[in-house]
């Protein structure tokens, strides 16, 4: 009985290794890269928090090894995020100040994915879209 269990276990491991073998090549190819991955999904929704609303707009943003994705300004967004260390709360506002109304129409943004090899899942709420753009520049301008 013990031999059958060992044989079954070995057979399962061999089958799993064979099935996952092609994926191993992909992982090794990523290891030889000079850059840690930075692939993000950015969303915008009207509401106080992301858990209670559905995203109205979403884009992808890849920053390494080159800026690309469905984001309309990937290079500019990657520079701003890079300067902030990938932290949405630390994005420096544009040098040119923008005037916004005090109308309260909350907008919540999310940034989820991988930034320089580490998982990120961030959420931030702004009083309205004007304030969001004034404080995040090109990052959430889509």
UniProtKB/Swiss-Prot annotation:
Superkingdom of origin organism: Bacteria
Record flagged with keyword Secreted: yes
Subcellular location: Secreted
Disulfide bridges in this chain: 63-78, 100-130
Cellular-component GO terms for this entry: extracellular region
Primary location: secreted
Family annotation (Pfam families): SSI
Keywords of this entry: Disulfide bond, Protease inhibitor, Secreted, Serine protease inhibitor, Signal
Signal peptide: 1-29
Site (Reactive bond): 67-68
Transmembrane segments: none
Gene3D superfamilies attached to this UniProt entry: Subtilisin inhibitor-like
InterPro entries for this protein: Prot_inh_I16_SSI (IPR000691), Subtilisin_inhibitor (IPR023549), Subtilisin_inhibitor-like_sf (IPR036819)
Gene Ontology MF terms: serine-type endopeptidase inhibitor activity
Subunit structure, as described in the record: Homodimer.
Chain's role: Strong inhibitor of bacterial serine proteases such as subtilisin.
Family: Belongs to the protease inhibitor I16 (SSI) family.
UniProt protein name: Subtilase-type protease inhibitor
Source organism: Streptomyces fradiae
Organism classification: Bacteria, Bacillati, Actinomycetota, Actinomycetes, Kitasatosporales
């Amino acid at each position: 009985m013990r031999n059958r269990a060992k044989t079954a276990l070995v057979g399962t491991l061999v089958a799993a290794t064979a099935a996952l073998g092609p994926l191993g090549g992909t992982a090794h190819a990523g290891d030889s890269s000079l850059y840690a991955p930075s692939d993000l999904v950015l969303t915008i929704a009207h509401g106080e928090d992301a858990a209670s609303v559905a995203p109205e707009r979403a884009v992808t943003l890849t920053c390494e090894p080159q800026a690309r994705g469905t984001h309309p300004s990937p290079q500019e967004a990657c520079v701003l995020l890079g300067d902030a260390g990938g932290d949405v709360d630390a994005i420096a506002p544009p040098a040119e100040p923008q005037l916004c109304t005090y109308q309260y129409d909350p907008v919540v943004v999310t940034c989820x994915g991988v930034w320089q090899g580490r998982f990120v899942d961030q959420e931030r709420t702004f009083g309205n879209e004007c304030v969001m753009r004034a404080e995040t520049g090109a990052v959430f301008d889509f």
